[in-house]
């Protein structure tokens, strides 16, 4: 709710909580818009890398410009090359997340993968089941995405009935039997192709801020159970 990575906790408090509860902090969000090559973006990147390092996070997410402006592939490739040395300096992994929104400058996971390879940087893909659903060509391109290049998968659900091009982050909830994203099917398809990595829930709906601890526990357990039943 605070808009800060650690809310009102110090870096040391976060580290101590992680040790106490045996939690590994895999990633924090996010460099935006990573494919705008500016001093402001570079400073934001360095600030978030310091934050990730301070709390012991392993990775930092990079999200593309999402305002309807076109960004040439060459510009995105250059941005990857510009930022990679910073990630290396701080010892943090980069996760590039294509955004499926119609106004996104990088919607395709396959294109993102190609740009990462062409830039010769050690970043990996972050696949999000919501954004996979929003991008019309995602299913057709799925077979071209190398599973070994995927570093993390974000999961959420949408029950809202409006067309996919009208969906926003505000409709993203935990998983239910009425999920329109096909998140369980996406997880099963990734596992069938050998994805050995981590899945993480990323709902955004405003009502989540009102949930109690019991609500959070129930929703996580129900979502995990849905995935396990589907992938059994």
Give the predicted meaning of each segment.
Residues 17-20, 24, 34-124, 184, ...:
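Active-site acidic/histidine proton-transfer and metal-coordination neighborhood
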Residues 84-180:
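Acidic/histidine-rich catalytic cores of soluble enzymes
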Residues 178-192:
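A short, acidic, amphipathic alpha-helical segment used as a generic capping/interface helix at domain edges
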